[in-house]
Amino acid sequence: MKYKLDLPALPVLPALLLAIVLTACAAACANKPPEDPKDYVSTIAAWRAARDADFKSGSNSPVPENRRAELLPLGYFPIDPEYKTAATLKPSDDTAVIPFATSTGTVRQMRRAGALEFTLKGQPLKLTAFVEVGAPNNDRLFMPFNDLTSGTETYPGGRYLDLERNVTGIYEIDFNRAYFPYCYYSPTYECPYPPAENRLKIPVRAGERFKTENSKLKT
């Protein structure tokens, strides 16, 4: 026997008001002024300064005390708003566990969350986002990558980006926030290496970089 679920009809006036509010919100979002480049530069500069302060005196600093004078403040490429770009996540149906080699010789287990497709300086590109098997926070998307600066201007073991998973599938990738794995500062950290699929065939001159040519030798 089938049952029919009767739901009360939404009154006309509240429904009309709801439609008006949603339309107004959509219009406001569409007409939102673009971010002022000066504000963006200030935001990234403040984020970098906060990292330096935390790494210098924070109780959980990854930089050993005997290397702080050498490494701090951290080295960065100049802030470039063109390295912040919109990306679309194409979810992955692949549930296979992928072993990631690490800096300590161990293996970390990852799964593909999907491919982030974007355009950077006019060139279409793609990076795979991963989630770690057994991680307490599956909302964190992990994007380790190499590019043509790896090993010369940046750490040979790649750089990292993180994103918080959302329901829209639309993200902002900001390479000005790309950072070195902690094993660059201290070999006590275990850092996964980027997989072959995340090796960009362009130089990404944004985010963290070596301070001097000698810094890359002390990994």
Annotate the PLM regions.
Residues 83, 95-99, 166, 197, ...:
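Terminal leader/tail segments of proteins
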Residues 24-28:
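C-terminal motif of bacterial Sec signal peptides marking the signal peptidase cleavage site
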Residues 91-157:
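Mid-length scaffold segments of soluble, non-membrane domains
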Residues 2-15, 19-20, 212-219:
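Short, basic, low-complexity termini and linkers enriched in Ser/Thr/Gly/Pro
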Residues 31-34, 151-153, 170, 177-219:
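Extended, aromatic/histidine-rich regions of cofactor-dependent oxidoreductases associated
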Residues 32-45:
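Short, low-complexity, disordered segments immediately C-terminal to signal peptides
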Residues 43-116:
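N-terminal secretory signal peptides
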Residues 144-179:
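Acidic, glycine-rich flexible loop segments
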